[in-house]
Amino acid sequence: MDLKTIAEELVAGCRENRAIENLDRLYAPDAVSVEAADMGRGRVTEGLAGIRGKHEWWDASMEVSDGSVSDPMLHGEHRFAVIFEFQGKEKQTGKAFEMKEVGLYHVTDGKIVREEFFY
């Protein structure tokens, strides 16, 4: 897949609640995910299984009541960015949250090899 197709499919998957399903299609097996801050699980997650675990943790821990995912913004031949905005609550505590973050994705050989989040 080319950059534009990967970017559009990542966004569509997020909007249609297919993010975990898209991992195998869009990510390299050795992809790396980097968070802006350590939320108790470390900032860096390596490998597709670890990234899948992050998604599963989010789904188990957070209840999203509203949100949006921007259209992808392409940058050159190998990168794109997406803006995520969500409102919801932590399932365990009921504490409400609002978040806005930018995801920067790096693509090599038709797969996402690195994602970085800024918030």
What are these regions (language model features)?
Residues 61-63, 87-98:
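Short, cysteine-centered beta-strand-loop-beta hairpins and adjacent loop/turn segments enriched
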Residues 66-68, 97-103:
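Short, surface-exposed coil-to-beta transition loops
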Residues 76-86:
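A short hydrophobic beta-strand element
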Residues 27, 86-88, 103, 119:
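Short beta-strand segments enriched in hydrophobic/aromatic residues
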Residues 20-78:
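A solvent-exposed, acidic/Ser-Thr-rich amphipathic alpha-helical stretch
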